[in-house]
């Protein structure tokens, strides 16, 4: 679960990982000193509403800046970029790694065909065409969620805040460029349909569990 804590004093994001790991992200406030975040006592004080020294181990603490950006070109001859090299996004959706995996999944089978001499090098041109809009859309959604979080924090302080985006779309855009562009099949380039199962869950939710 990815949980956004809209505390105007210090917004926080935390999520559950594998094997009992928890990841917390706190906003660095203007009054903070970077030296504070090198102090374990300071870190434990931030974590104290959720976990304590006697029931957790602090494995790592780091300060970083996040960005919302996307490269204009993902290929130069035999060099292709993917993941954070191609696009960077705020952490509000936890979607950065997923976007990178989609990049590589798109590339892997195309490179495999190239090595088998079953496709020409031009197939690599479809990589950016198919992934660019998805990555750009995901970045826009993470920005939207960030604006919503800012709005909740501002409202908690009694301030008026009107984010440009009031929500975010639940469905990824379909692939409109690349290999499927000239296909006459009406379903090509769209996500796999998710029928309702007997448990009243979507198929991908049942499979994931």
Q: How would you name each of these model-derived features?
A:
Residues 45, 113-202, 208-209:
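Helical substrate-recognition/capping region of FAD-dependent monooxygenase/halogenase enzymes
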Residues 42, 103, 199:
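Charged catalytic carboxylate motif
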Residues 50, 91-92, 174, 194:
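Hydrophobic residues in alpha-helical membrane-spanning segments
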Residues 23, 67, 87, 200, ...:
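Histidine-centered active-site/metal-ligand motif
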Residues 58, 64-144:
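Conserved mid-domain beta->alpha element of the FAD-binding
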Residues 1-66, 72:
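Conserved FAD-binding catalytic core of PHBH/FMO-like flavoproteins
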Residues 100, 204-205:
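Alpha-helical hinge/cap motifs
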Residues 16-18, 55-57, 90, 111-112, ...:
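Short C-terminal domain-edge/linker segments immediately following a structured domain
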């Amino acid at each position: 679960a990815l949980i956004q804590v809209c505390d105007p004093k210090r917004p926080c994001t935390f999520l559950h990982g594998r094997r009992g790991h928890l990841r917390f992200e706190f906003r660095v406030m203007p009054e903070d000193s970077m030296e504070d975040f090198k102090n374990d006592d300071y870190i434990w004080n931030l974590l104290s509403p959720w976990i304590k020294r006697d029931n957790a181990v602090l494995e790592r603490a780091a300060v970083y800046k996040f960005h919302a950006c996307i490269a204009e070109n993902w290929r130069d001859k035999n060099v292709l970029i993917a993941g954070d090299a191609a696009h960077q996004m705020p952490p509000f959706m936890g979607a950065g790694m997923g976007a990178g995996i989609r990049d590589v999944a798109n590339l892997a089978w195309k490179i495999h065909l190239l090595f088998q001499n079953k496709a020409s090098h031009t197939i690599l041109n479809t990589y950016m065409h198919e992934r660019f809009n998805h990555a750009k859309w995901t970045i826009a959604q993470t920005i939207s969620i960030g604006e919503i979080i800012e709005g909740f924090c501002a409202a908690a302080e009694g301030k008026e805040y009107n984010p440009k985006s009031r929500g975010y779309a639940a469905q990824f855009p379909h692939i409109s460029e690349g290999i499927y562009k000239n296909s006459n099949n009406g379903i090509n380039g769209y996500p796999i349909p998710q029928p309702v199962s007997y448990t009243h869950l979507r198929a991908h939710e049942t499979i994931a569990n």
